[in-house]
Amino acid sequence: ESEQLIMTMADMAGISTVPHALIKGNAGLAYITKRVDRNLTDDKIEMLAMEDFCQLDLRLTEDKYRGSYERCAKIIKQYSSRVGIDMAEFYIRLVFCFIVGNSDMHLKNFSLIETAEGSGEYVLSPAYDLLPVNANMPADKEQFALAMNGKKMNIRKGDFLKFADTCGITRQTAEKLIENLVKLTPKWIAMCENSLLPDELKDRLKKIIIERTEVLQ
């Protein structure tokens, strides 16, 4: 339920996400997503190459927490065929994940995907594995899985504005992107209230969203 909620919040924020839903099973609700690297067209299966940032940075899976978001930005600049659009999307995702307490955006939670089979052109894949980690695990005090401006905690608005320079985003544009997300706070709080989460988890998530958006104002 928590992943479905955060993914739906991301949809509301205009973030591209993999198709996702909750389905009823014998043991209760189950969360499902659709693979975006395989497409069935008529009688043919289109197979799109999809590489996560761990692979693109030539790192082993166990090193997925090593690195920085600055390094992620360099990977996008190096491999994306639409750098400007993908950099803005990447930036918005990081601000969003900060707001909802998703502190697990490591190198394997970002990927580039082929635009068409064999095209050799890659773009940032839709978002996946978005979770309110800080609400689910309140003992985890880190706000990010990778460093931004050399730190994973005590992130402030100034850190995002500085990071915008790395992404090739002007300060004015960064301010607007942040403002657009902060404006969604009342809707996100309402979504928490109406969600299937336990009340205690709802309260923790709402508190995180309110505190983080205040930091960004």
Which residue stretches match the model-derived regions?
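Conserved ATP-binding subdomain of kinase catalytic cores across diverse folds
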Residues: 1-64
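Conserved kinase catalytic-core segment
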Residues: 1-13, 63, 67-135
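A glycine-rich phosphate-binding loop feature that marks nucleotide/adenosyl-phosphate handling sites
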Residues: 25-30, 109-115, 181
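Catalytic-core segments of enzymes that bind and process phosphorylated/nucleotide-bearing substrates
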Residues: 52-75, 112-172
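ATP-dependent kinase catalytic cores of phosphoinositide-metabolizing enzymes
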Residues: 14, 171-175, 179-180, 192, ...
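Small/polar glycine-rich anion-binding or flexible loop at a beta-alpha turn
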Residues: 26, 175-187, 195
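Regulatory N- and C-terminal appendages and interdomain linkers associated
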Residues: 78, 118, 122, 166, ...
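A short beta-strand motif that forms the metal-chelation/ATP-contact edge
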Residues: 30-35, 186-192
